[in-house]
Amino acid sequence: MRGELWLLVLVLREAARALSPQPGAGHDEGPGSGWAAKGTVRGWNRRARESPGHVSEPDRTQLSQDLGGGTLAMDTLPDNRTRVVEDNHSYYVSRLYGPSEPHSRELWVDVAEANRSQVKIHTILSNTHRQASRVVLSFDFPFYGHPLRQITIATGGFIFMGDVIHRMLTATQYVAPLMANFNPGYSDNSTVVYFDNGTVFVVQWDHVYLQGWEDKGSFTFQAALHHDGRIVFAYKEIPMSVPEISSSQHPVKTGLSDAFMILNPSPDVPESRRRSIFEYHRIELDPSKVTSMSAVEFTPLPTCLQHRSCDACMSSDLTFNCSWCHVLQRCSSGFDRYRQEWMDYGCAQEAEGRMCEDFQDEDHDSASPDTSFSPYDGDLTTTSSSLFIDSLTTEDDTKLNPYAGGDGLQNNLSPKTKGTPVHLGTIVGIVLAVLLVAAIILAGIYINGHPTSNAALFFIERRPHHWPAMKFRSHPDHSTYAEVEPSGHEKEGFMEAEQC
């Protein structure tokens, strides 16, 4: 009996020894720092650690994930292993690829190899400093859950994603692979190129130089907007450390940002409204990790706006506190670009303590103040004479050049201004134009049939060869965009050019 017990003890000891970790296994947590990403959600910061006990092969990529936002830092891996750092920022998951990671090269879009009909060199932006121009996409791009068809490309290495143009383009609502004081007009080799093939829109700042830092060399990088909402930053040439770039004349940022606008009565000007901009989310990347041949990929996460029914909204398991607004037929957390309507229609109070069954017996037509209003008509704006912008400051003075097609230069009207007056004015204008054309035709027929009449003699005395000559010559080097202000005079703030 004792022999059997002793044998059992030996077996258990050997089993325990076999299951215990061997020396040297696991992670080699040496000193140093790797990729880092920082997501800013008001008052939220925490550090993530690598999961212990996972053995990585020497040539395998090691992945770290932070599910709470905040700051993510990793130790340097031994040998020649590369890394991918993944960070969850509530709205996006960012993956940062180091220079030696093969996927970073795959994310670079070779514009030179693309279809030439889909590639355009923006001649205005390529020859100016602190300019911005609107471009229409060939597809709806979901940005923070909001479908966008127009974006604004700036010479300063970023894309402005806002619907309403204001003076602080660099402050918020941007996609910034590397926002800095770039001057494409410094060199003939500097260009701002964009490419659109229907599924991806790419903007490339090619061989651009920093204003006042031209001796440091040229920068080449791009931002890609994919139709599924993914955003990619790819860096080909970064000749200097990004933290060394001065921000005294222009903000220096890398990341994403979005905001909503609120209209409030202006205390200074009667019957006017003040537009205040509130940034509700920002993703900041560590600028020290922006190097040549690196890349960042942002994958969008589901938001409340994607739910189109009350049942789907209320049963959502997202981290957002989704609520259903029956008046607007919209699912929202209350913090998005449509917050103005959410407040105006009392959606926050409507959703308190109510279930989807409570809305089924209500008359939808009577419940909605304006049944023709679409939840996706954009930000609520005003037609008042005065408009102010609060709560944002910047050192930038980028000017805006309107898109050649003239789209998107005026603000959207509020729901109450849409409807019969617009259609009635259009009809009256068409009728007047038809009557004018008919009158001219009848006058021509009459004059041709009565050459000795007073009207015919009046026009004969004033025949065209007595009129002063007025010729329009085409100047290939002249800009088709309106001048923002006289050359040599520059003032702070963004200026929007009026289209001629």
From Swiss-Prot:
Tissues of expression: Detected in urine (at protein level). Detected in endothelial cells from colorectal cancer, and in endothelial cells from primary cancers of the lung, liver, pancreas, breast and brain. Not detectable in endothelial cells from normal tissue. Expressed in fibrovascular membrane with increased expression in individuals with proliferative diabetic retinopathy.
Cellular compartment(s): Secreted
Post-translational modification as stated in the protein's UniProt record: N-glycosylated.
Extracellular-side segments: 19-426
Main localization, broad class: secreted
Function noted in UniProt: Plays a critical role in endothelial cell capillary morphogenesis.
Domain of life: Eukaryota
One GO biological process term: spinal cord development
UniProt keywords, alphabetically: Cell junction, Cell membrane, Cytoplasm, Glycoprotein, Membrane, Proteoglycan, Secreted, Signal, Tight junction, Transmembrane, Transmembrane helix
Source organism of this protein record: Homo sapiens
Assembly notes: Interacts with NID1. May interact with CTTN.
Biased composition (Polar residues): 368-379
Bilayer-crossing regions: 427-447
Signal sequence extent: 1-18
Glycosylation sites recorded in the entry for this protein: S33, N80, N197
UniProt biased composition (Basic and acidic residues): 47-60, 479-494
Cytoplasmic membrane side: 448-500
Name under which the protein is recorded: Plexin domain-containing protein 1
Family stated for the protein in its record: Belongs to the plexin family.
Gene: PLXDC1
Region (Disordered): 20-39, 46-78, 359-379, 479-500
GO CC list: bicellular tight junction; cytoplasm; dendrite; extracellular region; extracellular space; neuronal cell body; plasma membrane; receptor complex
